[in-house]
Structure formats: structure tokens, C-alpha cells
Amino acid sequence: MADEEIAALVIDNGSGMCKAGFAGDDAPRAVFPSIVGRPRHQGVMVGMGQKDSYVGDEAQSKRGILTLKYPIEHGIVTNWDDMEKIWHHTFYNELRVAPEEHPVLLTEAPLNPKANREKMTQIMFETFNTPAMYVAIQAVLSLYASGRTTGIVMDSGDGVTHTVPIYEGYALPHAILRLDLAGRDLTDYLMKILTERGYSFTTTAEREIVRDIKEKLCYVALDFEQEMATAASSSSLEKSYELPDGQVITIGNERFRCPEALFQPSFLGMESCGIHETTFNSIMKCDVDIRKDLYANTVLSGGTTMYPGIADRMQKEITALAPSTMKIKIIAPPERKYSVWIGGSILASLSTFQQMWISKQEYDESGPSIVHRKCF
């Protein structure tokens, strides 16, 4: 395959998972946790080939002896040295490519500080010597993946949730809303409410166990109060989970209390609106003429929208907020966990997109600020 040589790379750097692969593919080749782990103890056995840091799945599998750190918090890179390690791992270990031979499409959350994308640009050109790169907004890519050009995307990942109205392919920046409440906060909340049940989860490694419980057993209730009553009166909602050491724990109303925080952030002690209200507020910030199209094309994307029951609940909540005659449609594609990456794969392989890349030459002439002019 001669094209493989120049295929663009698409890297969706999430706060929780990094999704990477080649433009034109229908799914990412590599999906691994955005984690860098460092040993908690001194190595005592010489010749074991111990490293001073581990990335991704390897960090995850050795988590018992490591301190795990996520370099991306709420969609913003907070530790650039670790971020470089993740990119290095992506290119050389996961995709096994030479970054100086491929254009690279990166993604970022909307309303990110400008310095964040400048630094991304700088590292790609100066550290990895990529021939060309581009930074795209995550939610816009999700809409591409759903085959639409108009709609509102409610994208919720591990670090940040945002609602982005898009009309005829243009994101409407004044109406984008961002909520720093996402998967990681729900994991922390589940750790807290499991502690109330008498199970103790405290370390960074144990947090990963709780994340797994959350992903396997949690769901969104259509009617929270009613579900609480059901849970109190019978054990029909209880499920058990086996911990790595063989101990079995039982989880009941925590299953839906945890993701309920998306609709009631007050559970986490936050004063913000829930995801349904944020979506509604975002639509209300748009021109009155286009709202109908947004209500009818509300697209969910990101891993935190994977809970069973979330689409029905969104439908119910937004119907309650919107005018009574409005047609409301919540679109929850089955592949929405990866729809940002899929959208990036579509975008980077379009012939019309090829003139959009920032080239190494343009970067050398203008410096990192070129990214604001070419990527919008």
C-alpha cells in the first residue's frame, strides 16, 4: 500500500484515553490511557530493565507499584514533559511510525487557553519534526462523524464536557458552553459514595478499579426519585463486582447515583447546571431561527455519554425545558466513544482539507501563533 507512507496521523488526546491511528481508517489503531506512571519505590534488582517512567497500558498493568498521573486535566495539558512522553509513546510504540514523515491532526477542547494549542504546535514541529499539523475542535469532529453539518454536540469525556452548536459546518463560538464535570469527577464521586458503604478506595491505582466498576455497572435513571425508591425497597438493582484480590463487593443505588451528578452537579458540591440545562442554554444562545435544527440534531459524543439510559433521560429533560411543540431528537451513535477520532479521520482524508494543514515552512516563518490563524 503506497499511500500508507503519507497517510496523516490522527491523535485524539483525551484527558482519560488517547486515541490514535491513521486518517482514512474507520477506527483508531491504538487506544490507551493518557497516564504516565513513576515507580513509588527504589528498584533493588539489577538488570531488571526497570524504567523511570511507564506510559499507557504498561503503566496501568504495573499500577500497583507506580504513582499514576494524568498530564491532561479538564482537557488542558498541565504537564508538558509527561505529554511529550505520551506522544513519543504514541508514535514510536503504538503506531510505530516516524512522526517526521506524516502530517499530524491533533484535537482539543473548545475554549482552551491559546497557550495550550501554541505549545502543542511547537512540540510537534520542534520535538517531533512533523512536516505538517493541524489542531481541530473535538465536538466539530464528532458532528462530522455523525454525517451532519448542523447540530449541537454534547461532548463529555474524562476531563471536560462541552456543548457546541454548529450550523452549516461553522461552530458558533458565542454559544459554546463548557462544564468542568466529566468522567474523572464521576469516578471520584463513586469512590466517595463507595467509601460510605464501607469499601475503601484511596490510591491512584484503586481509582482505576473504581473507574472500571463505573464503566461496567453504572447507568442513568429515567426518574431518579423513583429509582431511589425502587433501590430502597428491593435488591433488584444490586450487582456484584469482583475486585482484583478476589473480594466481591455489592453495589446498589450507587449504580445510578454516580452518573446522576451529570444532571445534578450539586451532588459534587458544584453550582453549575446539569448537562441537560447546559445543552438547552447553549441552544438558547443561538439565533432563534436555527434553534429548531439544533433541537432536532442533538448529538452525544465521548465516553461519559456511554451510560445506558442517558439518551432517554436527555430527551425527557430537554423536552421539559424546550417549547412544547418543539421536535427534539437525541442522537447517540453506538461508536460515540470514538466519534471525535472518527471525525478526525474523515477530516484529514478529505481532499479539500489538504490545503488547511500548517506546514513546517509556515511554522518556521510565523512561529507557534500560526495555529490561531489556520485552525479555527
UniProtKB/Swiss-Prot annotation:
Any GO CC annotation of this UniProt entry: NuA4 histone acetyltransferase complex
Primary location class: cytoplasm
Keywords, comma-separated and alphabetical: ATP-binding, Cytoplasm, Cytoskeleton, Hydrolase, Nucleotide-binding, Oxidation
InterPro entries: Actin (IPR004000), Actin/actin-like_CS (IPR020902), Actin_CS (IPR004001), ATPase_NBD (IPR043129)
GO biological process terms on file: axonogenesis; cell motility
Keyword Hydrolase: yes
Family under the similarity heading: Belongs to the actin family.
Identification of the protein by name: Actin, cytoplasmic type 5
Protein species of origin: Xenopus laevis
